[in-house]
Swiss-Prot record:
Active-site positions on this chain: 123
The protein's name in its UniProt record: DNA ligase
SUPFAM superfamilies noted in UniProt: BRCT domain, DNA ligase/mRNA capping enzyme, catalytic domain, Nucleic acid-binding proteins, RuvA domain 2-like
Catalysis: reaction(s): NAD(+) + (deoxyribonucleotide)n-3'-hydroxyl + 5'-phospho-(deoxyribonucleotide)m = (deoxyribonucleotide)n+m + AMP + beta-nicotinamide D-nucleotide
Length: 787
């Protein structure tokens, strides 16, 4: 028996190595027939000795019995989508934003010549997945889903032959989440469709649909028979840092058995990125797989952290999409549509033409700035493109074909739906401590909910799944309710009676009662859902979550000054003013008051300020937010350390200021606060922060007085009551430094289920080790809420 077990282990190791050389390195060392012989030998031995079968055996990729449904998986780190670039100018603008966002001297996080270095790789057209490894073994696979919650497809990903069930080599972190794309090659797609035709099965329109459909089969045996492949492009959660650069991470993953794009390249500056894009574009048709663009990422991971995220995409990455098929047609007219926020948007009505196999009669024009940029006139011959391979877009006017009777495109002075006045939006910018107002690209109907179009879209948004989640209220039902004047605002939904609903088209006794129950059940939304449901311009689902998590009460959100709102992640000054303007509007306030008053809504998850927000409001942070000319974060820190309070800075004389800063910066600070409007605005911001419960000193001084100051803690294994990120946040709020590695300087190790080498090392060093219950007890003792 010992000999059989030894032979099984030898065969598994040998087959794993051959899989690695074939699928990852593309350097097979044996012919297929020899691989098959070894595989069948292992399969026979395991059949004779089923007690020796393990989940990571190469034979266990064949699939199992059908599942009844997929379970939900919450991503510890959201799987975000990328922003898109369609033109070279978009890439240049992206590079400018990155460079300005880093605001670092050349050579610090930059490459040669002070240029940002980017990783470059093709954008595979497949399905994004997450692979979670613990102690080197694949324990879970999940789809991206909505970015926050995906589906558990662990059984199916195990059948994808180039996904390692166990990592190669050594040095990988205890917890490693690999992210990448499951796709189907062009040849594999053709073979699949041919075989489907032979058996009279369903064929697929393209490799992307084939890959997605194959991976989400409830019967994993079907998935196992599909020619799926995987290519990794990055990381999710990990218990330890792997490298300092994105390419370094991918090289490490490749060493551990992960397939990485053979087209991966480092570019020094945006010009090299554009050259890479053109090169891949020229070779696109010769590649063995479908791609729809190229992904560029800031290579330095510290720079990525510096840039951060906005809404649902990182600021440090972009997908440069390839142009889709283009066609010529005639612009017959331009009509204007009214959206949820009142935006009056031009839409091109075209002479129908087939583009990439789809008949197109309408195209987006985005806004009037785009119409002006194109020089578009009604009657023009235009080039249209299915931008991003999906949305038809007018990209160019063929000016030489313009007819004599061509007409200019005019914005209507009154709303085409309700007749209210249409006005152009204003944008607020802050530069050198001063605000300036410029004209925006968007025109808006001022009718608000008195406008039927806005009311319908506002209600559709309010009841949507990610907002108040009121089932049974479809678009057609909402149109009926508005047209019959049964509702004039979201608050009126809660006043609907059974007699009103049953008279609507498509409703009977059961469906009417179900709808009334769904409306009643929506009376206790989370704060984040309610904020999102209000439909504040430029406030999407992620920003609503940030507002709720950070400010933790609707009253604080309503009162917050724009500058205070900019403390929050991904909230810029323009969005901050949109939020402020929304809550200052008398009509909006009356609707909210009605919802929370007579309609009986009770918002959940309100309470104390979020720890992340609290930690961000240091004195030096406030000084930096004031945008004093020539004063950056370093100078702000010096001012905070020197004076300790905002009032001391405002009232400091010239000599005191010169002791803190060089002459130019000192003069800039004095000139700024000599303007009484600037001084009063700074005081108002500070007063509101303190009113919200913030009492800061300089960050350095604050940490010194905290109970865990000077202590280094390490988290390992999994936690059940809170995520590791939340635990880290709570420990840091008490002054602790949370590290990813154990050393003699470590004060305490928190070990949950699955703790590996870090726990072993902690025991060897004789360190204090706490389980999750002990951690929670310690946090409670120190006055930190754990629920």
């Amino acid at each position: 028996m010992k000999a059989v077990e030894t032979r099984i282990l030898e065969l598994r190791a040998e087959l794993d190595q051959h899989n690695y050389r074939y699928h990852v390195l593309d350097e097979p060392s044996i012919p297929d027939v020899e691989y098959d012989r070894l595989f069948h030998e292992l399969k026979a031995l395991e059949a004779e000795n089923p007690h020796l079968v393990t989940p990571d055996s190469p034979t266990q990729r064949v699939g199992s019995a059908a599942l009844s449904a997929f379970t939900q998986v919450r991503h510890e780190m959201p799987m975000l989508s990328l922003g898109n670039a369609f033109e070279e100018n978009d890439m240049l603008e992206f590079d400018r934003r990155v460079t300005e966002g880093l605001d670092l001297p050349a050579g610090d996080l930059f490459g040669e010549g002070g240029k940002v270095q980017y990783s470059c790789e093709p954008k595979l057209d497949g399905l994004a997945v997450s692979l979670l490894y613990r102690d080197g073994a694949l324990v879970r696979g999940a789809t991206r889903g909505d970015g926050t919650t995906g589906e558990d497809i662990s059984v199916n990903v195990r059948t994808v032959r180039n996904i390692p069930l166990k990592l190669q080599g050594k040095g990988w972190p205890d917890v490693l989440e690999v992210r990448g794309e499951v796709f189907m090659s062009k040849a594999g797609f053709e073979r699949l469709n041919a075989s489907q035709l032979e058996i009279g099965g369903k064929t697929f329109a393209n490799p992307r649909n084939a890959a997605a459909g194959s991976l989400r089969q409830l019967d994993s045996k079907i998935t196992a028979n599909r020619p799926l492949e995987f290519c990794c492009y990055g990381l999710g959660q990990t218990s330890a840092e792997i490298a300092d650069t994105h390419i370094g991470v991918l090289e490490a993953l490749k060493k551990w058995g992960m397939p990485v794009s053979r087209e991966l390249k480092l570019a020094n500056g945006v010009e090299e990125c554009l050259a890479y894009y053109r090169d891949i574009g020229e070779r696109r048709l010769t590649l063995t797989y479908e791609i729809d663009g190229v992904v560029f990422k800031v290579n330095n991971l510290a720079a990525q952290r510096e840039l951060g995220f906005r809404a649902r995409e990182p600021r440090w990455a972009i997908a440069h999409k390839f142009p889709a098929m283009e066609e010529l047609t005639e612009l017959l007219d331009v009509e204007f549509q009214v959206g949820r926020t009142g935006a009056v948007t031009p839409v091109a009505r075209l002479k129908p033409v087939k583009v990439a196999g789809v008949m197109v009669a309408n195209a987006t024009l985005h806004n009037m700035d785009e119409v002006a940029r194109l020089g578009l006139m009604i009657g023009d011959t235009v080039i249209i493109r299915r931008a991003g391979d999906v949305i038809p877009q007018v990209v160019q006017v063929v000016a030489e074909r313009r007819p004599e009777n061509a007409r200019a495109v005019q914005v209507p002075q009154t709303c085409p739906v309700c007749g209210s006045h249409v006005e152009r939006t204003q944008l607020i910018k802050r530069s050198k401590g001063k605000e300036t107002v410029t004209e925006g690209a968007v025109y808006r109907c001022v009718g608000r909910l008195a406008c039927g179009a806005q009311l319908k879209q506002a209600i559709i948004h309010y009841v949507s799944r990610r907002a108040m989640d009121i089932e049974g209220l479809g678009d057609k039902t909402i149109e009926q309710l508005v047209d019959e004047k049964l509702i004039g605002s979201p608050a009126d939904l809660y006043k609907l009676k059974y007699e009103q609903i049953i008279d609507l088209e498509g409703f009977a006794e059961i469906s009417s009662n179900k709808l009334l129950k769904a409306i009643a059940d929506s009376r206790q939304p989370t704060l984040a859902r309610f904020i999102y449901a209000l439909g504040i311009p430029d406030v999407g689902e992620e920003t609503a979550k940030v507002l709720a998590r950070s400010l933790a009460s609707l009253e604080r959100v309503k009162q917050a000054l724009p500058e205070v709102l900019t403390y929050l992640p991904d909230v810029g000054l323009e969005v901050a003013y949109e939020i402020r303007s929304f809550f200052e509007d008398e009509h909006n306030r009356s609707v909210i008051d009605a919802l929370l008053g007579e309609c009986g809504l009770q918002l959940q998850d309100q309470g104390e300020l979020g720890a992340e927000f609290a930690a961000s409001t240091t004195l030096e942070g406030l000084i930096d937010k004031l945008h004093i000319p020539s004063v950056g974060p370093g100078a702000a820190q010096k001012l905070a350390d020197r004076f300790g309070t905002l009032e001391a800075i405002i009232s400091a004389d010239w000599l005191d200021m010169r002791q803190a800063l060089p002459e130019k910066q000192a003069k800039s600070v004095r000139d700024f606060f000599d303007d009484s409007a600037n001084a009063e605005r700074a005081r108002a911001i500070e007063a509101q922060l303190k009113d919200f419960g913030m009492h800061w000193r300089s960050e350095k001084k604050t940490v010194e007085g905290l109970p865990l100051a000077g202590q280094t803690w390490v988290l390992t294994g999994s936690l059940e009551r809170m995520s590791r990120d939340v635990a880290k946040e709570k420990l840091e709020s008490l002054g602790a430094k949370v590290s990813g590695s154990v050393s003699a300087k470590t004060h305490t190790v928190v070990a949950g289920p699955g703790a590996g080498s870090k726990l072993t090392k902690a025991n060897e060093l004789g360190l204090t080790v706490l389980d999750e219950d002990a951690l929670l007890k310690r946090l409670i003792e120190l006055g930190v809420a754990v629920d």
